[in-house]
Amino acid sequence: MAVISMKQLLEAGVHFGHQTRRWNPKMAKYIFTERNGIHVIDLQQTVKLADQAYEFVRDAAANDAVILFVGTKKQAAEAVADEATRAGQYFINHRWLGGTLTNWGTIQKRITRLKEIKRMEEEGTFEVLPKKEVALLNKQRARLEKFLGGIEDMPRIPDVMYVVDPHKEQIAVKEAKKLGIPVVAMVDTNADPDDIDVIIPANDDAIRAVKLITSKLADAIIEGRQGEDASVEFEADTKADSIEEIVEVVEGDNN
């Protein structure tokens, strides 16, 4: 049983890697073929590894793990925020601030400041302050919310980190590894998989692909927390959705 079907992966464009000249040779074992200068990801491996990632995240959530979703590129920002929120977890979907994990104490101080400004407004303090000061406070709050709003209520450093595009989020991955935090990631053909604990070979540049994978991991968290199966499983049908079909789809899309 698979949590994501081959058909779903194909329809979302998960199989499209980067141009061959931009590849990382360490991803060779996850590449099925090359067509028209584009690497094609081996979706049979993606199906299997997505199952493993689902189980890993589900089991972590069942043990009350704090899970941080990270994806700051525009293709990932919305899905990361929406799915982390749906799963009752935390996210960073704008620029990663250096030291977010390794200098957590300083980040907590900034979060405290954000909460303080919000409390001032709720208690009516803004009404008695000069307009210029209120404008400055609003500007400060907006900036803090942009970068820290998704982790405002995160109780501690995360137990697991899920990353969309570890090539872009190298600083985040390095901080997690330094602290021994396992990293689950969508890894495209241009990335280095060595620092990733749970790899999902996938196109991390297509909005639909990011949404598909990210939503399944959110399902895993919900299942782990509630003890219910939040995801629809699919029988692996290698005849109907064989890896050879990927080549046909790629050739069709590239013609």
UniProtKB/Swiss-Prot annotation:
Family: Belongs to the universal ribosomal protein uS2 family.
Single GO molecular function: structural constituent of ribosome
A GO CC annotation given for this chain: cytosolic small ribosomal subunit
The name this protein goes by in its record: Small ribosomal subunit protein uS2
Segments passing through the bilayer: none
Gene3D superfamilies per record: Glucose-6-phosphate isomerase like protein, domain 1, Helix hairpin bin
Signal peptide boundaries: none
UniProt entry keywords in alphabetical sequence: Ribonucleoprotein, Ribosomal protein
GO biological process: one example: translation
